């Protein structure tokens, strides 16, 4: 009998800081369970309008300038706990001209019409650009830039983004989120066969592992993951960028073990470091293109 897979569905928003903080957990799930798991996303629309939004605990909402200052402080505080990089300097996500996070949600739905894998890479880039690069990701210019980076067809993306089709798909996501009462993000729906469980808020990998074992009655087990340089390099190549905490979590590495592997890969020039706010990302080293000026042909 074919083994069932577990589905982990995240109710999310591209600019949600604890969704950003959950990236190490989701990547660890994908690494430890491999083909036994499928992750997907439902857009929840965190901020319809900053002027009518209000988070009393963090004093976010109303005036965009004050909100941006407090969001940056909140994200920095969260970063100390979840470990993902955040850039507070120059943070101006919301303004009179850009009062909502709905454009990012709709953009993800537009990307989904083309390719699920590229759409998820696009979602990751929106998270990185919002949290670690302090870019105003609600603008069409930035969204097109990010869509191009992940290989989406820009003409189709822009058409789907603006013709109402993606907005309709987003409205469907909002309805699904309301049916599951996913009002805070992240929230997770974990499904295995005809059984399911909702998790609300940030949760550790250990929590997910326990729930997967419970839902599958122990049938789904972690794969054997080698904790070595080759495996870490494969992980970085697969995801195209990884924060240190993502590597350490996925491979259960101590700080010392991680630093040893990182130092070796940097010395061998297998990877590069890219500074990002209060942290950095590890990227695969890409061989530069060489172009023949006569033929116009470029190759690596």
For the regions a protein language model found, what residue spans apply to each?
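Extreme N-terminus of proteins, especially the signal/transit-peptide cleavage junction
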Residues: 1-6, 34
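Generic detection of long, well-ordered alpha-helical segments
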Residues: 19, 65-68, 116, 167, ...
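Short active-site neighborhood of thiol/selenol oxidoreductases, capturing the structured segment around
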Residues: 4-17, 23-26, 39-45
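A short acidic (Asp/Glu
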Residues: 20, 51-53, 199-201
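A generic fold-level signal
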Residues: 3, 102, 182-183
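Residue-level marker of regulatory loop/turn positions in helix-turn-helix DNA-binding domains and
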Residues: 18, 96, 100, 236
